[in-house]
């Protein structure tokens, strides 16, 4: 079955991106290649319905943390929503290191960006159910602590100083980089 046939039989997967997969960022090329095979489509800019922490880890890699709530360090994170085929989802999962414990893909509730309402009451925006790549639970709490329990609303390369994979040290794994990062002081 071709990817186009697959898309006709399976509903698309809705994926919220908040970091390097966004337009203009280092890993957006993967989504562009998926656009060319009809395995992905841009749906618009959105923000999280719940306040969540978004932080930077080693090499300026962004991590959304699955710690919903309100208060200092949590924001309605802004990003982009994509419809992705099953083939496209497999490619994104590979990039995000799902099988090796870098991220985990979990449900997320979104609102269209620019809508000031929050889900319900008085003509509020329709909440969209999607999935996002969150920091793996094995290190998320340490990542939150290492960032001083402060997150940000939108990922920018200027704030995080992202380092492309090709320019990172080759003598250790990304999980080792994460362990070193969370065990160091700021």
Roles of regions detected by a PLM:
Residues 2-186:
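Glycine-aromatic micro-motifs
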């Amino acid at each position: 079955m071709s990817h186009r046939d697959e898309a006709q039989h399976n509903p698309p997967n809705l994926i919220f991106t908040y970091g390097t997969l966004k337009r203009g960022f280092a890993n957006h090329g993967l989504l562009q290649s998926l656009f060319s095979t009809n395995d992905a489509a841009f749906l618009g800019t959105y923000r999280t319905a719940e306040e969540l922490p978004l932080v930077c880890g080693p090499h300026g890699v962004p991590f959304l943390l699955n710690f919903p709530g309100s208060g200092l360090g949590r924001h309605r994170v802004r990003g982009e929503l994509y419809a992705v085929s099953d083939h496209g989802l497999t490619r994104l999962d590979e990039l995000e290191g799902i099988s090796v414990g870098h991220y985990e893909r979990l449900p997320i509730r979104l609102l269209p960006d620019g809508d000031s309402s929050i889900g319900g009451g008085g003509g509020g925006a329709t909440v969209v159910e999607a999935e996002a790549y969150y920091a793996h639970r094995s290190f998320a709490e340490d990542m939150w602590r290492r960032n001083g329990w402060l997150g940000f609303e939108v990922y920018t390369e200027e704030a995080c100083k992202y380092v492309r994979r090709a320019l990172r040290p080759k003598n250790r794994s990304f999980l080792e980089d994460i362990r070193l990062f969370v065990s160091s002081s700021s």
